């Protein structure tokens, strides 16, 4: 059973029920909606469709809303595009003008106040580069370092620079409210630079009565990397968003950053998603490149909770095949990882009772050669903490909450399973044995380790470990 989860971006390529159904069967665990594109009406149709499909299949499939985040773009040119050469002088202005070969407007009026001489501006995903040589209250005068064709509304990036624009825009607020109204499970927060960005979103979620949505912080710039500790402590998970990160940070640093973030999240018990260009060639081709296969495998070796498909499923020619391919790579890679050795050699910080019991549960499962760990968890917290230790046995996450059932689909190694309320520990143990045996197809006499709380219906009461034979 595959331990690493798969996040798939929905789009035109998978807007029909048959394709989405096949993607779920192929291994999709989380459906991602990118709110940088499409209308609320488009997203509403896709949310309704994924809910319909997951109900028919009886599968826990979480829904993730990915925000647009702070956006910096140029506006338009008189003729739609221009061509710039190295050492040309070019101006970005806060004034509203029609762009030409010498200047263009920007969408952020405060940009001239945030930049200094010597700062670098990248456009069109880093294909064009500019160095700031001077500025006024409204203009940023630059020297073209790398030229090329520049067309309307291209994105702007500022390596190693944190701008002062307000993090939570009105557009993001509208999108988040829409997501809350349509019962999304996760919000992926774009361009998180510090913990205050997350606190702003939490405050807004509280304002609209949607505090049950989990936050995934997307790390896409230098500030996000530098502040990973405080960001990790404020969110429910991290996305290593390598696309924009590779523009804002020298690309040769990305592999080390990816590994450090994944390790940090594992130590803290946070879910971590590795994203961007994992099987990019499958947008057009039925088979991935050898480098892409190794990229996916390396993320799995690192211990990522999930791997993500973007354009491959949203707009590619082979969305189902892309999911199937990613699942095959992950499954085969996991067979070659010695999880028991990793667990025994890792140094985890045990901070509370849940940590201690979760760690002991994993150790006991190894010691007695158990076939599974069964976690009874209302909120999913205990299941996530057990998952954090990456045990070598399967984890079954039993919950009475449908919301938790879907959310656990993003947790490494956890097979979510709905169960009824249990009036006593005896009934709890009976249900745990019965459901675990059924879900994992265990044999009579196989041992499982059960952990959870004695108090029924309350979160945070994890206080037991028990060994049972099915």
Residue ranges and their predicted role:
Residues 1-470:
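Non-catalytic helical/linker scaffolds that mediate oligomerization, partner binding
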């Amino acid at each position: 059973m595959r331990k690493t989860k798969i996040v798939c971006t929905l789009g035109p390529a998978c807007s029909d029920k048959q394709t989405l159904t096949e993607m779920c069967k192929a291994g999709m665990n989380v459906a991602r909606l990118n709110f940088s594109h499409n209308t609320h009406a488009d997203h509403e149709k896709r949310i309704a469709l994924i809910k319909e499909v997951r109900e028919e299949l009886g599968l826990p499939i979480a829904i993730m809303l990915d925000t647009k985040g702070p956006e910096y773009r140029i506006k338009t040119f008189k003729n739609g595009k221009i061509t710039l050469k190295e050492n040309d002088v070019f101006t970005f202005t806060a004034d509203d003008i029609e762009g030409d070969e010498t200047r263009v407007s920007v969408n952020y009026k405060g940009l001239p106040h945030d930049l200094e001489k010597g700062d670098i501006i990248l456009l069109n995903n880093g294909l064009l580069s500019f160095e700031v040589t001077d500025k006024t209250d409204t203009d940023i005068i630059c020297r073209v370092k790398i030229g090329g064709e520049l067309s309307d509304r291209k994105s702007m990036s500022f390596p190693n620079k944190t701008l002062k624009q307000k993090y939570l825009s009105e557009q993001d607020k509208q999108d988040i409210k829409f997501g809350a109204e349509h019962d999304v499970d996760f919000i992926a927060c774009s361009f998180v630079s510090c913990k205050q960005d997350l606190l702003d979103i939490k405050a807004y979620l509280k304002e609209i009565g949607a505090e049950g949505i989990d936050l995934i912080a997307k790390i896409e710039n230098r500030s996000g990397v530098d502040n990973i500790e405080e960001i990790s402590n404020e969110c429910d998970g991290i996305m290593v968003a390598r696309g924009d990160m590779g523009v804002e940070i020298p690309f040769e640093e990305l592999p080390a950053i990816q590994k450090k973030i994944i390790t940090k999240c594992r130590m803290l018990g946070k879910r971590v998603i590795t994203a961007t260009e994992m099987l990019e060639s499958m947008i057009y081709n039925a088979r991935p490149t050898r480098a892409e296969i190794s990229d996916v495998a390396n993320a799995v070796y690192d211990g990522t909770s999930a791997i993500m498909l973007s354009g491959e499923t949203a707009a590619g020619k082979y969305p189902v095949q892309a999911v199937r391919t990613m699942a095959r790579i992950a499954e085969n890679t996991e067979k070659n990882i010695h999880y028991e050795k990793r667990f025994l050699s890792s140094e985890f910080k045990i901070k509370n009772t849940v940590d201690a019991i979760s760690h002991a549960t994993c150790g006991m499962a190894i010691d007695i050669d158990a076939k599974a760990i069964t976690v009874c968890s209302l909120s999913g917290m205990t299941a996530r903490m057990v998952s954090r230790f990456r045990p070598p046995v399967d984890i079954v996450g039993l919950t009475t909450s449908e919301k938790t059932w879907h959310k656990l689909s993003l947790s490494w190694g956890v097979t979510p399973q709905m169960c009824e309320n249990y009036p006593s520990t005896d009934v709890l143990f009976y249900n745990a044995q019965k459901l675990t045996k059924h879900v994992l197809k265990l044999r009579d006499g196989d041992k499982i380790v059960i952990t959870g709380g004695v108090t029924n219906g309350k979160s945070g009461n994890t206080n037991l470990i028990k060994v049972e034979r099915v």
